[in-house]
Swiss-Prot record:
Gene Ontology cellular-component terms listed: plasma membrane
Stated name of the protein: Glycerol-3-phosphate acyltransferase
Region (Disordered): 803-825
Pathway(s) per entry: Phospholipid metabolism; CDP-diacylglycerol biosynthesis; CDP-diacylglycerol from sn-glycerol 3-phosphate: step 1/3
InterPro entries, A to Z: GPAT/DHAPAT, GPAT/DHAPAT_C, GPAT/DHAPAT_LPLAT, GPAT_PlsB, Plipid/glycerol_acylTrfase
TM regions (residue ranges): none
Root EC class: transferase
Keywords linked to the UniProt accession: Acyltransferase, Cell inner membrane, Cell membrane, Lipid biosynthesis, Lipid metabolism, Membrane, Phospholipid biosynthesis, Phospholipid metabolism, Transferase
Gene Ontology biological process terms, A to Z: CDP-diacylglycerol biosynthetic process; fatty acid metabolic process; phospholipid biosynthetic process
Name of the encoding gene: plsB
Major localisation: membrane
Species, as recorded: Yersinia pestis
Length: 825
């Protein structure tokens, strides 16, 4: 580099250092993209901009990547280590320098032809200042490339809203070997890079925003809304103009009013807020979503719903991943001042709890949702319908998902892909309110005062987790499961073909399974799981560390799913972090520390335990079986678990099929044997008395679930002809009784939805005949197996209410030594 150029770059770098604070995507490009800093790198930028180049250089030096200003010297030839695909617009248009990118690509390919050992990494990088999508009808296209003067003002105003996006590298060795090294290939490389950057920019900025009134006019002109307006006028005996005004009022209620400036401002506020409230936001598998957006997919984000914080957290994470924040379906209860107008400008559109009896509303909402898809906006909705009060996934509500498929049946949309997302917290600000509601308190309506009270409580929230699950492309799903789905395409009428409801139900279930597959274990939910399993919700520090180590080894060595994330910290580090959250008490004596979960916190902590209950349910069940039988064959263990697995699968959205269950159990058994929690004697699995304490704590994780199943099966066995409604009601009453008598703190223990799912599963599995009567011999077999795993006191409580005397004379469980840390039911 010449001396003058060095001086020029140094002078230009001075204002950039002050004005530019760019984010790098992904956060750790070396590990996430598999970059090798020891190999030569050719940086490829979309167009000639010295500001972009110096911004890139700052990030490269921060990431320990080669300096893009230092040329590469290969075989005695010196070539620039960066290349601009386009020259870009000029302030003085009469001077257009010669395009160098094709020549430089050709020179590099030539070097590979002459040196078989050479393999240069071609690394595409885009630098963006600001992400305003622009408005429809404005003269300047929103994807324009800036000239020098425009870039100066962009840096001045948007320097702190800039990002450097690294993409996956391309091996020039592979290009040379597979495609050759002539100039045609160099031209092709430049053309592909140009397309890559164009798609990437569209993914980051999104389509132009319509004027709100223009959008309403377009919706009013749609055939479906015209018909709904006419029906409204006829059914309510009002004028056509009045019916049309009703439709516009509904559009005003529903539609978002997205503003890039509001997003920019909220990013500043949220960045400040997260840094003070959270100790970190952990994001996993975001590259999947970036790739989908770049490939032109219409993305529908379907996260689990833990807290009102979910809306803000997910939009914040997506914005920092270089993606457009989605349009979010929010409950109409959030449309209060000032939250409603703010959320609306951040992309929220509002949805009522029910559409029943209002055809005009359902038509307007469906057409609005379809218009979002047609225009290419990403959309987010919570398939659970509302926030989970128990920490488990709720049964999915399928209305909006059904409308998503109906939007596909209008034709003309881009490929729609559902992206399940697990959102997890170490502290949920509403958890105290959830506990009150589960005890029967009336849900308080959202308002400004409630919001201010909630904000006042925000402090020390620990870590947050956003894990992107395995995407579910709708076209691929429909092609596989409903090959004839395109026959139902109709651009005017909303279609409800016979296959729609079964397909939507299956899709909803798959979404929930994939959300659970992407679960994040953390310090809070692991410590809560261990302490809630213990006798008096207390363990010595050594016992708790031993149990945390047991959980961590299980999750690492026999992982639940490839998308599940497990902390990379030691048990000691996790415990210290959890203690700093001020949820637990520490009592010190001359022997050592005792970690205590206070009684008033116990119900609240079940929420966090339930977040990861599905990850440990099968190991807990194996532990419970071995604890009772003391020695059991693998075949017998598999038979017993197979009887109740369908119930667990339906309740907890487990991903293993019946066919996968034997192999899964073998893997878990091998890991439990490796930890010496059980002894594998070849044909039999045997209790290991030396490690009975951690095995007992592990077994406690499934105890309440099995008790709940035993309640329902005991009622079915005693009264085979009981109807479904009565069975669910009686089960809940008995569960409440059991929870009072035996000190069960879990609020989901007598949850109505849990028993509804259980009864539906029993019918599907053939325990209840088509006539509605239970098949007593089947229900009794499972009940007897379950009751053997319970303490005599719990068993007696259940049978004293439900079971006739002749069916309740099963043998007692053999006595087991009761070490410190055993749980009482």
């Amino acid at each position: 580099m010449s001396g003058w150029r060095k001086i020029y770059y140094k002078l230009l770098n001075l204002p950039l250092k002050l004005l530019v604070k760019s984010k790098v995507i992904p956060a750790d490009p070396v590990s996430e993209l598999g970059l090798d800093p020891s190999r030569p790198i050719l940086y490829v930028l979309p167009y000639n901009s010295k500001a972009d180049l110096l911004t890139l250089r700052a990030q490269c030096l921060a990431q320990d990547l080669p300096d893009p200003l230092i040329p590469l010297e290969i075989d005695g030839v010196q070539l620039p280590s960066h290349v601009f695909i386009e020259n870009g617009p000029r302030v003085f248009r009469y001077y257009v320098p010669k395009q160098e990118s094709v020549k430089l690509f050709h020179d590099y390919l030539d070097l590979h032809r002459n040196n078989p050992a050479l393999d240069i990494q071609m690394l595409p990088v885009s630098v963006m200042f600001g992400r305003s999508p622009g408005r429809e009808g404005h003269g300047t296209p929103h994807l324009r490339v800036l000239n020098g003067v425009q870039k100066f003002f962009a840096v001045l105003w948007l320097g702190r809203d800039s990002f450097v996006r690294f993409s996956t590298t391309v091996s020039l060795r592979r290009m040379a070997s597979e495609h050759g090294t002539d100039k045609t290939i160099a031209h092709k490389l430049a053309r592909v890079a140009r397309m890559h950057f164009s798609r990437q920019r569209l993914a980051a900025v999104g389509p132009s925003l319509p004027a709100r009134q223009d959008l309403f006019k377009k919706l009013l002109a749609s055939k479906a809304i015209e018909k709904a307006v006419a029906d409204e006028a006829r059914s309510k005996k009002i004028s056509h103009e009045k019916a049309q005004q009703n439709a516009i009022t509904l559009m005003e209620e529903i539609a978002a009013n997205f503003s890039y400036e509001a997003v920019r401002l909220s990013d500043r506020v949220l960045s400040w807020t997260w840094n003070r409230l959270y100790q970190g936001i952990n994001v996993h598998n975001a590259e999947r979503v970036r790739q989908l957006a770049q490939d032109g997919h219409e993305i529908v984000y379907v996260p689990c719903h833990r807290s009102h914080m979910d809306y803000l957290l997910l939009s914040y994470v997506l914005y920092h991943q270089g993606l457009v924040p989605p349009h979010i379906a929010a409950g109409i209860n959030l449309n209060f001042w000032p939250a409603g107008p703010i959320f609306r400008r951040l992309g929220a559109f509002f949805i009522r709890r029910t559409f029943k009896g209002n055809k005009l509303y359902s038509t307007v909402f469906r057409e609005y949702l379809g218009e979002l898809f047609t225009r290419g906006y990403s959309v987010e909705y919570f398939v659970e319908g509302g926030r989970s009060r128990t920490g488990r996934l709720l049964e999915p509500k399928t209305g909006t998902l059904s409308m998503t498929i109906q939007a596909m049946l209008r034709g003309g949309t881009r490929p729609i892909t559902l992206v399940p997302i697990y959102i997890g917290y170490e502290h949920v600000m509403e958890v105290g309110t959830y506990a009150k509601e589960l005890r029967g308190a009336i849900k308080e309506k959202e308002n400004l005062l409630q919001m201010l009270r909630g904000l006042r409580k925000l402090r020390n929230l620990g870590q947050g987790y956003v894990n992107f699950g395995e995407p579910l492309p709708l076209t691929t799903y429909l092609n596989t499961h409903v090959p004839q789905w395109r026959d139902a395409i109709d651009p005017i009428e909303a279609q409800r073909p016979s296959w729609l409801t079964p397909a939507v139900n299956d899709l909803a279930n798959q979404i929930m399974v994939r959300i659970n597959n992407a679960a994040a274990a953390n310090a809070m939910n692991l410590c809560s799981t261990a302490l809630l399993a213990s006798r008096q919700r207390s363990l010595t520090r050594e016992q708790l560390l031993e149990q945390l180590d047991c959980y961590l080894q299980l999750m690492r060595n026999a992982p639940y799913a490839k998308d599940t994330t497990v902390p990379d910290k030691t048990p000691e580090e996790l415990l210290n972090h959890a203690l700093n959250m001020n949820k637990f008490e520490v009592e010190k004596d001359t022997i050592g520390d005792i970690i205590i979960l206070p009684r008033e916190q116990a119900v609240l902590m079940t929420y966090y335990r339930n977040n990861i209950q599905h990850l440990l349910i099968l190991p807990s069940l194996i532990a419970s079986m071995v604890m009772y039988h003391r020695r059991i064959t693998r075949t017998e263990l598999l038979h017993k678990i197979s009887m109740i697995y369908p119930m667990l699968k339906a309740e907890l959205f487990l991903h293993y099929s019946k066919e996968q269950l034997p192999e899964t159990l073998d893997t878990l058994i091998d890991e439990l044997a490796r930890q010496q929690l059980i002894c594998d004697k070849g044909s039999e699995l045997v209790l290991n008395p030396a490690r009975i304490r951690p095995l007992q704590l592990l077994a406690a994780g499934v105890r309440e679930t099995l008790q709940r199943y035993a309640i329902t099966l005991s009622l079915l066995s005693a009264t085979p002809s009981i109807n479904r409604g009565a069975l669910e009601k009686e089960s809940r009453i008995m569960a409440q009784r059991l929870s009072v008598l035996h000190g069960i703190n879990a609020p989901e223990f007598f949850d109505k939805a849990v028993f509804s799912t259980l009864v539906a599963t029993l019918r599907e599995e053939g325990y209840i005949s088509d006539s509605g009567d239970a098949i007593q011999e089947h229900t009794l077999e499972v009940y007897n197996m379950l009751s053997a795993l319970m303490t005599p006191e719990v068993k007696l409580t259940i049978e004293s209410v439900s079971m006739p005397a002749e069916t309740s004379n099963q043998p007692e469980a053999p006595e087991t030594p009761e070490p410190e840390g055993k749980t009482e039911s």
